[in-house]
């Protein structure tokens, strides 16, 4: 009896334990959620304001939140002076360009280790650790001075939180991949090319090789005007692709046009312009061909608000989108600085456009560059959205149209002058003589 009672009690206790365990909520930590005591919150509120600003611009907060949810992290934070005054201005502008977002992210992730390393845990011998960018940092001790790569730790254990730690370092750490990207852009190696040479031609009369035409100096503009190199018309097929040859045979215009269209989309506010260039027309293909042949272009890109003001009548005519876009493309390489200096010096400047023979009028207004005439004018307000030495994109706040040419007043031809032959008048003496002599006098007949 006692044994059966004990078995029943055991089964009842087991049932209650299982029920309670099932009813309890699942309190497993959700990765990616951080609290106010996190090292990321401390970084954003710390005196490392320049680094925190770069983290926000690089769109890395969500990535770092996921990393903190999985493991502790160690952040090597450069002091503000290292990012403000001690950094090469060209390198800083390179990092802040929208098209170089991946380089900026790699640079910042290079400063973060997926583990917690305090100053007492610093290795006495040189030891390398993998960073969040999959590169390696070497931690060393040099005469009681902690170092990470070649940078000195000036504020060890500056910020300590349960999920991570921040060490202050004297300068920015630059990974080799980012340095190589910067060097390629600075030397224009990724967009430069060897001028192609034509195949030798044989003179059919002498059966000898024709003398080659004089060589064009490197970097000189193409011999043909850009209007002769354009495709015949918007109603015809798109312009053909560049001739055979590798990336060293011509400028890679297709890649550069694709790059600047991606920049427009990432920049924001120019989706309509990108859609017209790629989907509504074949201008993206034609621009790539022109750049491949050595021409340079400056695009005045209206923003989405300006494009929304276009009426259906303005876009419904055959070839209207192409003509509108042609008027916004200047066959020169101009930046915001060069155009502003020109209008400051000369007052008004007229730039050629691909909509021949119409020109784009530019003048200074309110400390900026104003394009167009009267109510149809537009201001340059997003300067240098994309500049790579071959293509320059400047954002404007209106759609430009060429000034309508007033027809000259028709000059009516003057009525032909009818000359009236006046009757010859005889002199008084002849008249008197006729009266006296009568009609028998021969001159009087």
Swiss-Prot record:
Signal peptide per UniProt: 1-23
Keyword Glycoprotein set for record: yes
FAS1 domain segment(s): 35-173, 257-400
Predominant location: secreted
Compartmental location: Secreted
Gene3D superfamilies: FAS1 domain (2.30.180.10)
InterPro entries (UniProt xref): FAS1_dom_sf (IPR036378), FAS1_domain (IPR000782), FLA15/16/17/18 (IPR044654)
SMART domains (UniProt xref): FAS1
Keyword rRNA processing: no
One cellular-component annotation, GO: extracellular region
Keyword annotations from UniProtKB, A to Z: Glycoprotein, Proteoglycan, Repeat, Secreted, Signal
Glycosylation positions in this chain: 72, 279
Function, as annotated: May be a cell surface adhesion protein.
Family: Belongs to the fasciclin-like AGP family.
Protein name: Fasciclin-like arabinogalactan protein 16
Gene name, Swiss-Prot/TrEMBL: FLA16
């Amino acid at each position: 009896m006692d044994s059966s009672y004990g078995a029943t009690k055991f089964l009842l206790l087991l049932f209650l334990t299982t029920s309670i365990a099932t009813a309890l909520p699942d309190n497993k930590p959700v990765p990616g959620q951080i609290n106010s005591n996190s090292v990321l919150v401390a970084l954003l509120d710390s005196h490392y304001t320049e680094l925190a600003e770069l983290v926000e611009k690089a769109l890395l907060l969500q990535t770092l939140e996921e990393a903190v949810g999985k493991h502790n992290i160690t952040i090597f934070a450069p002091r503000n002076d290292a990012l403000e005054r001690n950094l090469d201005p060209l390198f800083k502008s390179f990092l802040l360009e929208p098209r170089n977002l991946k380089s900026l992210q790699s640079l910042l992730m290079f400063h973060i280790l997926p583990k917690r390393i305090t100053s007492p845990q610093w290795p006495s011998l040189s030891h390398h650790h993998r960073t969040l960018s999959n590169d390696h940092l070497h931690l060393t001790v040099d005469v009681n001075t902690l170092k990470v790569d070649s940078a000195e730790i000036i504020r060890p254990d500056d910020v300590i939180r349960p999920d991570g730690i921040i060490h202050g370092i004297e300068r920015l750490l630059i990974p080799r991949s980012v340095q190589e990207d910067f060097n390629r852009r600075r030397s224009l190696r990724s967009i430069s090319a060897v001028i192609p040479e034509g195949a030798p031609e044989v003179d059919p009369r002498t059966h000898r090789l024709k003398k080659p035409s004089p060589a064009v100096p490197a970097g000189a503009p193409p011999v043909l005007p850009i209007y002769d190199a354009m495709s015949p018309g918007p109603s015809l097929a798109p312009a053909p692709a560049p001739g055979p040859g590798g990336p060293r045979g011509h400028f890679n215009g297709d890649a550069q046009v694709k790059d600047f269209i991606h920049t427009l989309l990432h920049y924001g506010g120019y989706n309509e312009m990108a859609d017209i260039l790629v989907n509504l027309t074949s201008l993206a293909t034609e621009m790539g061909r022109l750049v491949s042949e050595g021409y340079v272009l400056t695009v005045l890109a209206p923003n989405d608000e300006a494009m929304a003001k276009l009426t259906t009548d303005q876009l419904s005519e055959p070839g209207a989108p192409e003509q509108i876009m042609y008027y916004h493309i200047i066959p020169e390489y101009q930046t915001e600085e060069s155009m502003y200096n020109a209008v400051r010096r000369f007052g008004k400047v007229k730039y050629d456009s691909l909509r021949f023979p119409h020109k784009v009028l530019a003048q200074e207004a309110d400390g900026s560059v104003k394009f167009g005439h009267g109510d149809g004018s537009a201001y340059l307000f997003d300067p240098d959205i994309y500049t790579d030495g071959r293509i320059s994109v400047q954002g404007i706040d209106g759609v430009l149209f060429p000034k309508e040419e007033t027809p000259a007043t028709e000059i009516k031809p003057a009525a032909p002058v009818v000359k009236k032959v006046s009757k010859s008048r005889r002199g008084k003496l002849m008249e008197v003589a006729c009266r006296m002599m009568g009609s028998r006098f021969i001159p009087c007949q």
